[in-house]
């Protein structure tokens, strides 16, 4: 039997907590409030079929051929045009999903032991993407409006220990669903500039607002001090694996080189498919329908929580968009220990501890309101309340 010797970085890799929990959802009858999956109801299958036929008829050979690592030029031009600040297409790098963007950024900016700042809590996938580079991940205290500016200044470090960047999701954050306020954005950008601290802004959910668009991106306020990440996974389909990075010109070449080494380029056909649905105006018509669907789903979960959680000492936030809300259990109760009781009642969620880089809060949990039907949401919240009563 061959004796394979693993790299030290591989020894430190761990399975995704969320992916492991998603295995539970394969149990018959389970209602999953766990995954960060967009609703399949939003997948524009007929429009994709028409766009695919058009691409193959007009540009089929190129769509199926190797292509430039930067990405399909018309798609990069479209992205630059719809972003709310002055972006040149040469600053846009197409990635194989936002997850690859995180990996590329980590490879370019992180050395072993480098200090990297994140919100409290933060996106688990970012922690996993950065982990092979072996950073020192430091959590910055956060409240309902976002990162606390004083704590950012205290944890930015200096000299050789100065943080490489702060990773932040200002809009409908995963996992909490919170949105950073206008005042906090202004203060964050000003403080980051004063500290000479780069920002990595991740915005996969920004188009999924319910009644009012969120404030303008951090990157729009200081384009040279930020790397911006976007995605088509939540507004079209995650199976496309299509995201993008907008980078300052001084950063772009190294990100491009990392992309070339990683996978040469994002699938050409998928890029042309998305370019086609942008060009023909479908995306502009489609996104408002997603907003309305998710708003109704969120309202159903809010109503169910208000009805079922009375007197249980449970609190939760009220997101203005996105896919998630954040729930806090009563003092002394563990979300990790609650999960098996919930699964016994055919409901799954993600314990919040997985989203903390340090000092996890085991009283928290993430609920997704977009994939279950409104009837299933009511059933699931009632079951969750029953599990909480039993655990109390």
Segments the model singles out, each with a brief description of its role:
Residues 28, 133, 194-195, 345, ...:
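Helix C-cap/helix->beta junction micro-motif
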């Amino acid at each position: 039997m061959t004796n394979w010797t693993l790299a030290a970085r591989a020894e430190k890799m761990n399975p995704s907590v969320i992916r492991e929990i998603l295995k539970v959802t394969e149990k018959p009858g389970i209602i999953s409030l766990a995954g960060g999956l967009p609703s399949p109801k939003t997948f524009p299958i007929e429009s994709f079929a028409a766009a695919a036929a058009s691409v193959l008829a007009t540009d089929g050979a190129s769509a199926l051929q190797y292509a430039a690592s930067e990405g399909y030029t018309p798609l990069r031009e479209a992205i630059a045009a719809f972003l709310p600040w002055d972006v040149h297409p040469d600053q846009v790098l197409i990635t194989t999903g936002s997850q690859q963007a995180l990996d590329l950024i980590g490879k370019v900016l992180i050395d072993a032991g480098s200090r990297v700042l994140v919100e409290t809590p933060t996106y688990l996938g970012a922690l996993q993407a950065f982990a092979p580079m072996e950073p020192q991940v430091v959590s910055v205290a956060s409240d309902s409006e976002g990162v606390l500016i004083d704590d950012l200044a205290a944890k930015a470090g200096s000299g050789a220990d100065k943080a490489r960047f702060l990773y932040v999701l200002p809009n409908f954050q995963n996992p909490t669903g919170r949105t950073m306020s206008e005042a906090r954005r202004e203060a964050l950008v000003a403080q980051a500039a004063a500290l000479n601290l780069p920002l990595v802004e991740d915005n996969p959910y920004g188009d999924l607002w319910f009644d009012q668009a969120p404030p303008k991106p951090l990157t729009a306020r200081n384009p040279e001090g930020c790397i911006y990440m976007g995605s088509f996974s939540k507004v079209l389909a995650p199976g496309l694996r299509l995201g993008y990075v907008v980078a300052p010109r001084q950063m772009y070449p190294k990100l491009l080189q990392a992309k070339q080494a990683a996978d040469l380029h994002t699938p050409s056909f998928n890029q042309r498919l998305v370019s086609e649905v942008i060009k023909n105006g479908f995306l502009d018509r489609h996104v408002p329908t997603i907003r309305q669907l998710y708003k109704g789903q969120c309202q159903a979960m809010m109503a169910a929580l208000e009805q079922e959680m009375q007197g249980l000492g449970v609190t939760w936030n009220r997101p203005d968009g996105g896919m998630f809300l954040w729930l806090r259990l009563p003092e002394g109760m563990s979300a990790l220990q609650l999960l098996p009781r919930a699964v016994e009642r055919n409901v799954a969620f993600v314990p919040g501890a997985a989203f903390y880089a340090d000092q996890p809060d085991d009283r928290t949990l993430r609920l997704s309101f977009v994939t279950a039907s409104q009837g299933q949401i009511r059933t699931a919240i009632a079951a969750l309340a029953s599990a909480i009563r039993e655990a109390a």
